[in-house]
């Protein structure tokens, strides 16, 4: 397959790229284009002659999103419209990469059919983008609690944030150098989620576009976990020193001005049944990430 992929230099995008190229031998077309420029997007998609379009790029600047709402709308919703319409023009599958933050934090165990109810700007923009993608006959792949390797920048340090992404890498980086790590806990951050592995998300998305599937898909494992439970499982799988774990509130500056959904756990059973993709246990997910860190390669499919 030939796939136009936006956001390939980002964390999730680099995993999609890695899976498409290394596991499936696909060609990924990831030329940087101004995604808010409709003419430029159409020209790029037409000239690339892809078999599918995957839109993963975002405006990854929380402060700018809030200070320039017009730019935020253009960078999320209008950009999605541009790529979805460009894919429709040449009649190829379109997939939008979305998030569990389209839910409000009280909808634990949400399925692919659960109505979104975002409580912050990022979730709202993603939910609006989902409507655009689905209205144009595309698909939506929600990624959640994404951990794993940043293949475009594998040596870059990771920091814990109020969500679940990067959590495992930031913990392992600290404990492997014998530094204590404080696991954030509290009702004002994302305290419960369904973790995923970046490469696993890439595999789900590959199956979606290869099969020309439409609708909503969830990219995660089978487990619902708290931050504390994820930290303790990580210590066990990676063979780290549990005594270095600490537990406490997140620094206020880490989420200043943000409203964050507490419980974003979801079910991916329907996705697994529809696509035939595995639902990894938490232990298998962490073991796959450990394999990536040791070998620098994707773990075999379970």
Each language-model region and where it sits:
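Glycine-rich Rossmann NAD(P)(H)-binding loop
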Residues: 183-192, 217-224, 274
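Conserved Rossmann-fold NAD(P)-dependent oxidoreductase catalytic core, especially the SDR/UDP-sugar
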Residues: 81-117
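Mid/C-terminal beta-alpha module of Rossmann-like enzyme folds, strongest
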Residues: 197-257, 290-302
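Active-site Tyr-X1-5-Lys
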Residues: 117-144, 169
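C-terminal amphipathic/interface module of NAD(P)-dependent oxidoreductases
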Residues: 243-244, 259-302
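N-terminal Rossmann NAD(P)H-binding glycine-rich loop of SDR-like oxidoreductase domains
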Residues: 1-20
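NAD(P)H-binding glycine-rich loop region in Rossmannoid oxidoreductase-like domains
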Residues: 35-78, 86, 101
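NAD(P)-dependent short-chain dehydrogenase/reductase
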Residues: 136-199
């Amino acid at each position: 397959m030939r796939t136009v992929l936006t956001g390939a230099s980002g964390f999730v995008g680099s995993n999609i790229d890695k899976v498409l190229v290394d596991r499936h031998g696909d060609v990924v077309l990831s030329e940087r284009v101004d995604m808010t420029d409709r003419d430029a997007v159409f020209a790029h998609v037409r000239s690339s002659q892809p078999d599918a379009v995957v839109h993963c790029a975002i405006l990854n600047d929380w402060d700018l999103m809030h200070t320039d709402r017009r730019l935020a709308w253009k960078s999320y919703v209008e950009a999605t419209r541009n790529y979805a319409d460009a894919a429709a023009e040449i009649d190829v599958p379109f997939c939008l990469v979305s998030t569990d933050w389209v839910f409000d934090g009280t909808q634990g165990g949400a399925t692919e059919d659960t109505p979104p109810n975002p409580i912050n700007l990022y979730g709202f923009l993603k939910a609006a983008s989902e409507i655009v993608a689905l209205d144009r006959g595309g698909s939506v792949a929600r990624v959640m609690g994404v951990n794993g390797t940043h293949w475009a920048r594998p040596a870059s340090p990771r920091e814990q944030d109020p969500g679940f992404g990067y959590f495992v890498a930031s913990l392992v980086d600290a404990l492997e150098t014998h530094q204590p790590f404080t696991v954030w806990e509290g009702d004002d951050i994302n305290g419960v989620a369904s973790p995923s592995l970046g490469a696993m998300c890439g595999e789900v998305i590959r199956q979606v576009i290869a099969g020309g599937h439409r609708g909503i898909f969830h990219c995660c494992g089978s487990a619902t976990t708290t931050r504390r439970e994820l930290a303790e499982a990580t210590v066990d799988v990676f063979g780290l020193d549990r005594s270095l774990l600490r537990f406490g509130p997140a620094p206020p500056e880490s989420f200043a001005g943000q409203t964050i959904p507490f419980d974003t756990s979801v079910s991916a059973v329907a996705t697994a049944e529809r696509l035939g993709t595995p639902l990894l246990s938490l232990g298998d997910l962490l073991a796959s990430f450990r394999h990536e860190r040791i070998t620098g390669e994707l773990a075999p499919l379970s």
